[in-house]
Amino acid sequence: MFLSFCGKVPRNEGAAFVAPNATVQGDVILKAGSTVWYGAVLRGDDGQLIIGENSNVQDNAVLHCDVGGAVTLGRNVTVGHSALVHGCTVGDGSLIGMHATLLNHCVVGKNCIIGAGALVPEGMVIPDGSVAVGVPAKVIKQVSPRSEEHTS
């Protein structure tokens, strides 16, 4: 469902799929080939959300930001089931695991894997090609070439 908020209207810039019970509200841009699955909530009421080409936001995930903030997902990003992505940037080809939480101003580099249930604290920077897990998240290794094939 697409909802306007204070004059801000979501934009579908190229055949993005949005499940019937997903909510996309306010200043949200869905790039070509992106998908938003069942129960997901994308709230662009306080800042802009950009969902990159061929990225997917899976069931029950929530994307939001504080006033003046933004959420930017690069191309080919996967946001896992029930993840919370709040006011941050995720680089191309990265995977955000199920139930992971990304807080304000954190940056996840390109081709990263954030483990299921991980908490990426406010302002943390995860370098390109990293695997980060835990609460709080810690980088434990670099993505293997085989894993990188699946994230890019």
Predicted regions and their residues:
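Compact, Lys/Arg-rich rRNA/RNP-binding cores from ribosome-related proteins
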Residues: 22
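Glycine-rich hexapeptide-repeat left-handed beta-helix
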Residues: 1-12, 17, 39, 45-53, ...
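N-terminal glycine-rich anion-binding loops that anchor highly charged ligand groups
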Residues: 25-31
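Short Gly/aromatic-enriched secondary-structure transition segments
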Residues: 33-34, 51
